[in-house]
Amino acid sequence: MGSRRAKGRRPGGYAKTPTVFQMEATECGAACLCMVLGYFGKDIPLEQMRIETGVSRDGSKAGNLMRAGKRFGLEVHGYKKGVEGLLKLPVPCILHWNFNHFVVWEGVKGKDYYINDPAMGRRKLTLEDIDSCFTGVVLCFAPAEGFTTSRKENRLSAMVAARLKGEKASVFSLMIMGIFLIVPGLVIPVFSQVFIDDILIGGNSDWMTGLLFAMIITVIYKAGFMYYRGILLLRLQNKLTLLSGYRFLFHLFRLPISFFSQRYAGDLSQRVDNNNNVSIFLTSDLAQTLLNIFVAAFYLILMFIYSPLLSAIGIFLVLLGLFVMKNTAKAISDLSMKVQMDQGKYIGGMMAGLTMTDTLKASGSENEFIGRLQGYYAKCGISEQKLGFRQEAMKAIPEVSASLIGIIVLLVGGIQVINGNMTAGMLTAFTALLTSFTQPVSELAGFIRNIQTAKADLSRVDDIMRYREDGRFEENGREDMTEKLIGDIRLENISFGYSILSEPLISGFSFDLPCGSSIAFVGASGSGKSTMSRICSGLFQPWEGEILFDGVPLQRRPREVLSSSVSTVSQNISLFSGTIRDNLTMWNKYIPDNDIVEACKDACIHDLITNKPGAYDYVLAEGGANLSGGQRQRLEIARALVTNPSVLIMDEATSALDPIIEKKIIDNIKRRGCTCIIVAHRLSAIRDCDEIIVMDKGKIVQRGTHEELKEQPGHYQRLIQTM
């Protein structure tokens, strides 16, 4: 496919590319390259393309897209063009858009200009729109010699197999129910034929009572089995929802911190619903449809026994309707994905606003925020409206098809009765069978509509389930030990960055920190201090070099030992609605009360807690809203101390405290004898550290004690003047 398209490519024209939606704002370039490769016949998962294009918290660069395209076997050329020059380039190509986005240029069709936007889907634009948004940077692609195509695996089939694994008994029971339900569907049309031909026309009134009794028994039989089948489906649905929900959340919370830093919390919470929707689709839509098709096959056999001609007419019209529905399905799939993305942005924006109400009110920005939120909501409404139009059109197809089938069958069947090829009872029975056959087939319209939504749900779930877990959860090669760490830390030639295709942010970083000593990272904003603290805690994995705890590489230490030995106090305070005890212990019931009290005393928060109603069982509001900023920060410090850590990492942990309280807490921490890594802008927090490392653009520019550094001209002298 790729080679044929390569030969037929010429300047201008139109190329319809497959739509790949970005899951986060920073991966538009990766999604665009997936679309271009998909057009040439090579389907690459978005999660793989993220890595290949070096997507970081700052997105991806055009140069990264070019290098990735070449690795996948494409010829890539970058140009600087105006709109007139763009119209002469072969399509598809990738455009830099609005100086902060990438889109796929599909070209011109008639009088319309098309782009495929990974954030919004396919868009029809005017030349003025393109001129105002196109920055002039364009990347052109063509299959190189040796380019190979690859088909995307059927994720829906794989998902069905994975989720129904171990449910053979339930599926078998449902199939048995389907077989039993075939009987009344086949018998009732026969009863209709007997009633018309033998009782009404034939005059055998003696048969009336027996036939009526048999029909009542059949209806009761059908109702009983339908009820039992519904119970089985409900049980299977609940079981699948619980199991898949557990697996989803289990995997979600084992993902690296970088995953969460690039996504809205509201969007992630919506994906829990997406995961549940997939399970509901399996049991309510897929299972029901498979049973309907199974039953329809038996109706079809009996229909051919009655009249092959009428059966052939009915099948032809049904297949025609299915063909039309299939051609509508792809558009519904893309629109469903767009709706879910817009809903995720809206919910994420709403949640962000609810967590920053103080800031909004203090700055008087309520109207601006509401306007921004209304923009998200309007996008949701527009997307839902477009999807609704398509879905309503698809709903109409089976209704029109069923009416057309009924009219034609009645017309042709009437001729057959007049010619003596059928009796009136046979035509009535056939019509009943045809209705029973077309009803489940007509329900395929709803199924096709729902399967497109399920594919969109699955894409958003797969974005999480295919993401590689945090390396800290890998158990291979870890030592078998249960004792806490002593607290010796050594970093040897550490390099790290947020994009594998860019220069490292941290490079050549080394230090040796003996047990019980302290070190501070200082520097201007963006110098890499917080990044370095996260590397020390194991949240970020270095590209090069080693982190040694007590002389053993960090990756060989059991995760449980690291969690109990290393505590971190972040500059972002995280408190949830619950008791103070739960906030301190994170629901760990094995932490003794004495350790909780001692930690709170060292954090200078114990007296405040005991004065609250219920003391340690006092319920905090969401985010600790019923505490002051300094109180929340002290509670965060106490949380880090309850496990009696050997290593304490503090990132701006005392920024909201007054100097007297700050000094008391630092003295209490030193008395504990734990190794300390401190990131701070305040001189009082770092002046007594055993070593101070001054950072600039990820590199060490000065190091030494406070007394040594304050005498040396350079960064540190300038920093302490502003502290």
Where are these regions (language model features)?
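Membrane-integrated ABC transporters
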Residues: M1-I188, I201, S205-G210, R229, ...
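ABC ATPase nucleotide-binding domain helical subdomain, centered on the C-loop/LSGGQ "ABC signature"
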Residues: S459, D463, L548, R556, ...
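Transmembrane helices of ABC transporter permease
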Residues: F213-K222, M226, Q288-M337, V409-M422, ...
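Cytosolic ends of transmembrane helices, especially the final helix of ABC transmembrane type-1 domains
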Residues: D342, Y346, D358-S365, F389, ...
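Hydrophobic alpha-helical transmembrane segments of ABC transporter permease domains
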Residues: P184, I196, S205, D273-L317, ...
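ABC-family ATPase nucleotide-binding domain "signature/switch" substructure
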Residues: T531-R534, S564-N572, I580-N583, A599-A603, ...
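Helix-to-loop junction immediately C-terminal to a conserved catalytic motif
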Residues: S537
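Juxtamembrane loop-to-helix connectors within ABC transporter transmembrane domains
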Residues: S192-Q193, F253-F298, T355, K361, ...
